[in-house]
Swiss-Prot record:
Its main location: secreted. The record marks 128, 133 as: Cationic membrane-docking site (MDoS). Expressed by the venom gland. The keyword Signal applies. It comes from the Eukaryota. This is Basic phospholipase A2 homolog Ts-K49b. It comes from Trimeresurus stejnegeri (Chinese green tree viper).
Length: 138
């Protein structure tokens, strides 16, 4: 029961189509987004944009900025479709906002893969108590 509660808390902190984003992470990197990134650094998971701790944390900052541009869909509730073709993510939505949401998630999955060498296990669970507000614009 405790494990289910912990997973529910982690799911709340991940924005976007949770199922889709998690699948993209596994396909791009072989990592689980929920267990590896949902509380990472100062920008991953719940909360506003803060000064990134490293390049991995910066990925979440950019992702939140991408979501901020969405106007006609809700990154928390809405779901989209995509396919995995020749080891590449292909967003396949007729709805322009859902397609853009898919593109945001695709971009962050690729960006995380490109920054795997900056991932610091010590920052995997950060309570964000010492994170500084950022002046970085989206």
């Amino acid at each position: 029961m405790r494990t289910l509660w912990i997973m529910a808390v982690l799911l709340v902190g991940v924005e976007g189509g949770v199922i889709e984003l998690t699948k993209m992470f596994v396909q791009e990197m072989g990592k689980n987004a929920l267990t590896s990134y949902s509380l990472y650094g100062c920008n991953c998971g719940p909360g506003g944009r803060r000064k990134p701790m490293d390049a991995t944390d910066s990925c979440c900052h950019v992702h939140k900025c991408c979501y901020k541009k969405l106007t006609d869909c809700d990154p928390i509730k809405d779901r989209y479709s995509y396919s995995w073709v020749n080891k590449a993510i292909v967003c396949g939505e007729d709805n322009p906002c859902l397609k853009e949401m898919c593109e945001c998630d695709k971009a962050v999955a690729i960006r995380f893969r490109e920054n795997l060498d900056t991932y610091d296990k010590k920052k995997k669970i950060n309570l964000k108590l010492f994170c500084k507000k950022t002046s970085e614009q989206c």
